[in-house]
């Protein structure tokens, strides 16, 4: 049981208590259900790869978003990973295409632009009729570094913008940190 708990703890966002709950839940399931769970994990690992265009997760050479003729071709939203893409898709606001970098520039961790999907992004911009690139990267040192690098690299080809950052809905101003408040002020928009 300790091995199972340890494996669950390795998953992002899973602490010791949640790992223990998951392990106990699985151990109380019928063997066939556990086998189906294990088969689904193995199948996902072997059958899911990356879209050859945007690098989002896909079981096919091209993901559903890249294949969708209803999406706006001239608009690319750059994200760090597929989790960010899925979060944006949940809003149902963005109707363009995506490009998944596969991480963020982090010199401290030895991750430079050459380890990310930057070269294919530049190639897409040169080959496709791109009218704007939107950077939707985490508001962190790494996200800011990556955004600055990409903005300098891509501005000669097309306009580059970055999503606004600010206060989450329902939050109290007094609990927000200075950087968040500063960004919220900088990203303000006039009321219609």
Swiss-Prot record:
An example of a GO molecular function for this protein is: zinc ion binding
Residue ranges annotated for the Toprim domain, each copy included: 74-168
Q: Which Pfam family is one of this chain's hits?
A: RecR_HhH
| GO biological process terms on file | DNA recombination; DNA repair
CDD domains attached to this UniProt entry: TOPRIM_recR
Give residue ranges of zinc fingers (C4-type).
51-66
| InterPro entries noted in UniProt | DNA_Rcmb_RecR (IPR000093), Rcmb_RecR (IPR023627), Rcmb_RecR_Znf (IPR015967), TOPRIM_dom (IPR006171), TOPRIM_RecR (IPR034137)
Task: Give the keywords, sorted.
Answer: DNA damage, DNA recombination, DNA repair, Metal-binding, Zinc, Zinc-finger
The family line of this record is: Belongs to the RecR family.
Q: What does this protein do?
A: May play a role in DNA repair. It seems to be involved in an RecBC-independent recombinational process of DNA repair. It may act with RecF and RecO.
According to UniProt, the name of this protein is Recombination protein RecR
- Organism of provenance: Parasynechococcus marenigrum (strain WH8102)
Q: What is the lineage of its organism?
A: Bacteria, Bacillati, Cyanobacteriota, Cyanophyceae, Synechococcales
Gene from which this protein is expressed: recR
